[in-house]
Amino acid sequence: MRRVAWLLAAALLGLAVAWDFATATTFLGDDHLFRVFARLEANPLVAFASDKHGGEYYRPLPMLLWWLLERVSGGRAWVFALAAFVLHALCAGLVVVVGRRLGFAARTAVLAGCLFFAAPSEREAALWFAASTDLLAAAAVLGAVALFLDDRKWLRAFSVVLAAVAFLCKETTLVLPVLLAVARWFCAQNQGRPRSVRQCLRPTLPHCGVAVSYLIVRALVLRGLGGANDPLAPWWGRAVQLLAGLVHSVTAYGPLPEWVAWLAGVSLLVWAAAASRRRRALAGFALVWVMVTLVPLPVAGWVVGARYFYLPAVGLMLLLALALETTSALASVFAVALLLGFGLLSGHHRATEVRLYRQAVAAASAGVAEGLAHGHRLFFVSGGVKDLDLAIKLDKDMPEAVRGAVVIPDVPASFIWLPPEFADRLDFLLARPSLPPSGAYRFGEARLVGLARREEAPDLDEVLTRLPELRILRLGYKAGRFSVEDRTESYMRGRQ
């Protein structure tokens, strides 16, 4: 009877989390860049040998996954949502496996996996399709650690393969050899076996060799070190961002008020660290995992968003589960239910945003389609929708003529699919320094370029002076629906 109850609880947990993926997902932001790659590149393997990430990063495996999903799904979002759910569930399961290999009790390891699976921030990261980069990387890292700690040598060899997979997904996983050495150290300590730095480092040499090989290939493909041209936050700003990421990893990003998230998150982290001190070896591993996985994050410049903390959250959930180890089963169930409840609240909030976003894009698409029918090709759309040009051009219901048009949103640093005939005339609208660093994402014959950042963007009057044929569309929200209005004539009269 007890087993049936636990199986029922697990099924309810899975269904509750799956609900978010069914209702709160759509294509946003960088998702459109990956979709254009999948739509235009005939061979996805080209990302392994040439720069398809604008000189920023070398991450060919996630691009291969996106290519496959786009081709299989025909652009239907539910296929991407299903893949994201499976990846998130896989990572949660691997948290359990890693916990058991390290010596965590079965109940504690399972609890850590459930906490990770239910946590709002980790689910939020998984709900953004572009964060599949982070999910794939996390799955590969966790799998590599699990195999590395296995007693069978032939399985340990496969951890090197998974290390290569992790590196080809995201650069932050280059800390994997350190995680492997740390895992071996604490595993030996927990088992009361003698240990030395040399014994822990030697087995990681093949992984280090793969890391060096990856860096060489990356430099050759990107023709340099890569990286984004985004401005860097000051050192203290990045420190605050790291702390904020940890706090939100055990609470939620929204719709909780920030002060509530900080108060609850800091209290929870302090309590977990204090309550788990009696199991120093296991708690030490969890804390070191968090610190090691945080080390490469400040390189990003602005460390804002749940996706950055997906891998560090593994250590946080192991620490929380360890702190709950001596409590009753009811307390553990309550902890999972609390995170699940926060997640459902956050998911409902996001589902509303997704619904409004889809309505806004649909309304803008209708306005652009009407303009195209009248021979217009340049549009400015106010309404706060980033990368609107890409979203509209990826809509299969739009006329083919949209490929030769340009939709300029009022969101700085948005990306546009730039037709060759407009390249010179629209150059003044582009970011300086360029977005991406190489000047453009080049997929097939298409060029995707970033518009100016907020502080350098020209005002609308200057844009109209240079582009007098520009049509001005305005998105409005009234009576529960979005509509679009052509305000070109009224704006021109106001200028006169």
PLM features per residue range, with description:
Residues M1-R495:
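Polytopic membrane enzymes that build or remodel cell-surface glycoconjugates and lipids
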